[in-house]
């Protein structure tokens, strides 16, 4: 089968840095034990399992503050998605050692929020309800940051915003087209709003790659965890912008061969938190796949994964 390897794809620098920090923590005998990650270090179940194999456990809950209460001692790693000041403060109260793996792009958004709120602004934040990145961003100034995900949320914003200085900003991993559309709706309601688009460069170029390269494919396969917002947005971009059907899979085991019926060329991309070896297995399988040759339909030889985490230096 013809396979188009959509590029760029896969790991971004924030994800790589977060995983390296977590590995270095696991290998550092000077850090207090046990070591926990507060939420998934990046949104990929394979990565979570690999850290569990190294003795680093992931704890999760309805929100980060509640999840933190399950950690009694030792070291806590904060994930790439960022964390609220309340969680930092509670970790200090519990006398936990902290390793902060927050992506620098997320930190920049937090710094922006702090700066404008100090100057008496209200912040409208475009993001996904229930995702840890908006949770952390809203937590920077909960009384002044207003999370919106759809047009209806704009209509429900507090009336007093009309008389306030306002900025609109966003979660770094959203669809850039969705963010632009919502920001336009915000601008219509609040013509005086200041726009600060914080889509990270890695998200933007991966979405643009799908928009530009998927059009001549019959199907696009996005390799990424179901909890990975940026992976889900890549599938959405294929549908909405390139007009090419797309399926997101966590790994090769989730590939339904019936999707390949009548497909001549398939495009493959992957989310920013998807380990490269997992995507490579999908590409390798598809490249040898022949609908007419049943011997090429067996996924088993392509399922073995060895090292999936980036190499690190021991500190």
From Swiss-Prot:
Q: What GO MF terms are annotated?
A: 4 iron, 4 sulfur cluster binding; 4-hydroxy-3-methylbut-2-enyl diphosphate reductase activity; metal ion binding
**What residues bind dimethylallyl diphosphate, as annotated?**
43, 81, 131, 228, 230, 273
Per UniProt, where does [4Fe-4S] cluster bind? 12, 103, 200
What cofactors are annotated for this protein? [4Fe-4S] cluster
One Gene Ontology term from the biological process aspect of the record: terpenoid biosynthetic process
Q: In which pathway does it act?
A: Isoprenoid biosynthesis; dimethylallyl diphosphate biosynthesis; dimethylallyl diphosphate from (2E)-4-hydroxy-3-methylbutenyl diphosphate: step 1/1; Isoprenoid biosynthesis; isopentenyl diphosphate biosynthesis via DXP pathway; isopentenyl diphosphate from 1-deoxy-D-xylulose 5-phosphate: step 6/6
What chemistry does it catalyse, as a reaction equation?
isopentenyl diphosphate + 2 oxidized [2Fe-2S]-[ferredoxin] + H2O = (2E)-4-hydroxy-3-methylbut-2-enyl diphosphate + 2 reduced [2Fe-2S]-[ferredoxin] + 2 H(+); dimethylallyl diphosphate + 2 oxidized [2Fe-2S]-[ferredoxin] + H2O = (2E)-4-hydroxy-3-methylbut-2-enyl diphosphate + 2 reduced [2Fe-2S]-[ferredoxin] + 2 H(+)
Keyword Plastid assigned: no
Where does this protein hold isopentenyl diphosphate? 43, 81, 131, 228, 230, 273
The reply on keyword 4Fe-4S is yes
Q: Which InterPro entries match?
A: LytB/IspH
Record's keyword terms, sorted:
4Fe-4S, Iron, Iron-sulfur, Isoprene biosynthesis, Metal-binding, Oxidoreductase
Matches recorded under Gene3D superfamilies: 3.40.50.11270, 4-hydroxy-3-methylbut-2-enyl diphosphate reductase, catalytic domain
Known EC number = 1.17.7.4
What does this protein's record comment on cofactor binding? Binds 1 [4Fe-4S] cluster per subunit.
Superkingdom of this protein's organism: Bacteria
Active site positions: 133 (proton donor)
Binding sites annotated in the UniProt record for (2E)-4-hydroxy-3-methylbut-2-enyl diphosphate: 43, 81, 131, 172, 228, 230, 273
**What single Pfam family name could you report for this chain, choosing any that match?**
LYTB
What's its job? Catalyzes the conversion of 1-hydroxy-2-methyl-2-(E)-butenyl 4-diphosphate (HMBPP) into a mixture of isopentenyl diphosphate (IPP) and dimethylallyl diphosphate (DMAPP). Acts in the terminal step of the DOXP/MEP pathway for isoprenoid precursor biosynthesis.
Q: What protein family is recorded?
A: Belongs to the IspH family.
Which protein is depicted?
A: 4-hydroxy-3-methylbut-2-enyl diphosphate reductase
**What organism is the protein native to?**
Exiguobacterium sibiricum (strain DSM 17290 / CCUG 55495 / CIP 109462 / JCM 13490 / 255-15)
């Amino acid at each position: 089968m013809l396979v188009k390897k959509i590029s760029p794809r896969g790991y971004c620098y924030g994800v790589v840095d977060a995983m390296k920090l977590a590995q270095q923590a696991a290998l550092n005998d000077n850090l207090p034990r046990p070591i926990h990650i507060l939420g998934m270090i990046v949104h990929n179940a394979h990565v979570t399992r690999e850290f569990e194999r190294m003795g680093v456990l992931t704890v999760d809950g309805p929100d980060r503050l509640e999840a933190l209460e399950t950690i009694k001692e030792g070291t806590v790693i904060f994930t790439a998605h960022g964390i609220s000041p309340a969680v930092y403060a509670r970790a200090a109260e519990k006398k936990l050692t902290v390793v902060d793996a927050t992506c620098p792009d997320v930190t920049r958004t937090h710094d922006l929020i702090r700066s404008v709120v100090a100057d008496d602004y209200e912040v409208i934040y475009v993001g996904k309800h229930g995702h840890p990145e908006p949770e952390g961003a809203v937590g920077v100034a909960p009384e002044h940051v207003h999370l919106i995900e759809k047009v209806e949320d704009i209509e429900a914003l507090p009336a007093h915003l009309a008389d306030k200085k306002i900025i609109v900003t966003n979660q770094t991993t959203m669809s850039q087209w969705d963010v632009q559309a919502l920001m336009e709706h915000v601008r219509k309601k609040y013509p005086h709003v200041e726009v600060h688009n914080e889509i990270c460069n890695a998200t933007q170029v991966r979405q643009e790659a799908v928009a530009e390269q998927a059009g001549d494919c019959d199907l696009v396969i996005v390799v990424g965890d179901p909890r990975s917002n940026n992976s889900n947005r890549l599938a959405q971009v294929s549908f909405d912008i390139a007009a090419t059907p797309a399926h997101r899979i966590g790994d090769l085991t989730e590939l339904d061969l019936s999707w390949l019926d009548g497909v001549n060329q398939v495009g493959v991309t992957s989310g920013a938190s998807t380990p490269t070896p997992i995507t490579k297995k999908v590409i390798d399988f598809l490249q040898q796949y022949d609908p007419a040759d049943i011997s090429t339909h067996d996924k088993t030889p392509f399922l073995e994964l060895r090292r999936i985490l980036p190499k690190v230096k021991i500190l």
